[in-house]
């Protein structure tokens, strides 16, 4: 149960490609995966394939970096190091987990690169505020309601049949500034309706 790497890579690839323009030269994908070679990652492969299609003849450098062996402090240091190397600052930074997204958000603010580096993040807690302010271009959100429903369904099948034989792909949504503003309006409307 969850989001498959292929599904996640395809979805991220679509969004990364939508941010590629004639000025895009470098894309960096940050993952925390138990993979020796980033080229073996389905996520990296799908993003790379989508970007190459969108780029056409433009030569875009796509790199992946594995931050698996790092803790919170080390992740923060690794992300900061990316921005300290002025020649290697990516035009698009893809973050595949909440911690890396938060570190990237902070680094973009610290180095005064908000709006210059497009961050495609993961998770929606305080990141929604950064999306609203334009610091993070878009963030990925797993449909937790659907995840819960599938969990109950799988457990029910297991209790009834003694097994479950399906892999449940959970939907993912990408939230940009317009989507976040819509969510806020709906939440405000729901809140006002419950008070009345």
Feature locations, PLM:
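Hydrophobic alpha-helical
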Residues: 51, 67-129
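Short, solvent-exposed amphipathic alpha-helices that sit
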Residues: 8-12, 38-61, 74, 78, ...
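Loop/turn elements at helix/coil->beta-strand transitions in domains of secreted/extracellular proteins
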Residues: 21-27, 55-63, 88-92, 113-118, ...
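Short beta-strand segments enriched in small/hydrophobic residues
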Residues: 25-38
């Amino acid at each position: 149960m969850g989001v498959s790497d292929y599904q996640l890579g395809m979805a991220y690839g679509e969004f990364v490609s939508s941010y590629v323009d004639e000025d895009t030269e470098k894309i960096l994908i940050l993952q925390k995966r138990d993979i020796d070679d980033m080229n073996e990652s389905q996520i990296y492969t799908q993003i790379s394939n989508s970007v190459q299609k969108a780029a056409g003849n433009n030569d875009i450098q796509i790199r992946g970096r594995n931050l698996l062996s790092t803790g919170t402090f080390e992740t923060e240091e690794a992300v900061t190091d990316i921005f300290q190397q002025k020649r290697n600052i990516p035009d698009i930074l893809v973050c595949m987990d909440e911690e890396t997204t938060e570190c990237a958000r902070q680094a973009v603010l610290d180095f005064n690169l908000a709006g210059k580096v497009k961050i495609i993040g993961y998770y929606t807690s305080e990141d929604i505020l950064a999306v609203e302010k334009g610091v993070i271009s878009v963030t990925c959100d797993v449909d937790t309601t659907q995840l819960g429903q599938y969990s109950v369904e799988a457990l029910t099948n297991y209790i009834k049949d003694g097994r479950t034989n399906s892999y449940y792909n959970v939907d993912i949504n990408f939230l940009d500034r317009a989507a976040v503003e819509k969510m806020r309006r709906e939440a405000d409307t729901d809140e006002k309706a419950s008070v009345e």
